[in-house]
Amino acid sequence: MDPVTSDLLSIVVPLYNEQDNVILLTKKIHEALPGYQYEIIYVDDFSTDETRKRIDQMQDQYVQLIHLKKNYGQSLALAAGIDVAQGRYIITMDGDLQNDPTDIPMMLEQAVNHGFDLVTGIRQKRQDSWVKTIPSKIANFLVRRVTKLDIKDNGCALKVFDRDIAKDLNLYGEMHRFITLLAFLEGAQIKQVPVKHHARHAGTSKYGLERVFKVIADMMLLLFIRKYFQRPIHLFGIFGVLLMILGGIANIYLLGVKLSGEQIGDRPLLTLAMMLILAGIQLFTIGIVMELLIRTYYESQQKRPYRIKKISKGGQVQ
């Protein structure tokens, strides 16, 4: 099949401890894009294994490697790669071989020939354990209910962006979970397409059940500051949400006791429940204030929230 565009493509892949995946991933990307002009931008998020060494050993002229100075998380690794990207279209994907590079031409066709600013995947027949699928389903449900936007798979990393939209996404902390929503708020025309999904080739997943609480905190932040979306309030937000949930459970229990005819006014649990809810609200509010302060700091200083140690191409430092 002939390429659907002669424009340069930038494939941005954040990596953390993917030494056993990165060589095969590079091979699969090359096989999926014959005839295309592209650059592969690997962003090493301070891996503790031999990820960087194996990329440099490939000496692949298509590959750029960004070395971050410390572990910043997936969102800032994505931001670093997008900032460096030169392509007319920017493609993001995970480095664990669960996304299939052969889906990229089909997604590009939607972006190039139909004018979509963002083409995002919907993973079919997910090859993940319940530890990942259940939190993902809960997160997708919550996002749809709260935002009223029918995003079917927020967690799919395989996306094709128009360059202008990708460059306008100010990703902080771990906002990659809402990257489709953020693009929508920027006015992007979005297309969702089914894509293949594979079991992780090697290594271990970095996600677990705690993801649900992070999603709740992130959504509450998005709803509060909408177009100021920056860094999620995980430190204060998670604890605030947990305290409010515990306080709510205690109050539901006390309501049942009250309805059964017993007195609850002199029970210490009533006081504790109210204190938990108030403490949760206070923690969450502190988190919001800190988020706004952080955003003001970075924008006023014109600083990026990550630091690059070095960039190499084909194994040679630039």
Residue ranges and their predicted role:
Residues 2-5, 178-318:
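Hydrophobic helical membrane-anchoring modules
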Residues 8-10, 39:
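Cell-envelope/extracellular polymer assembly enzymes that use nucleotide-activated donors
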Residues 18-32:
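Short, well-formed alpha-helical segments that are part of the catalytic scaffolds
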Residues 18-21, 47, 100:
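Donor nucleotide-sugar binding loop of glycosyltransferases
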Residues 26, 30, 37-47, 66-68:
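Short beta-strand/loop segment that forms part of the nucleotide-sugar
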Residues 44-53, 97:
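A conserved acidic beta->alpha catalytic loop
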Residues 64, 68-84, 89, 101-182, ...:
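Acceptor/aglycone-binding surface of glycosyltransferases and processive sugar-polymer synthases
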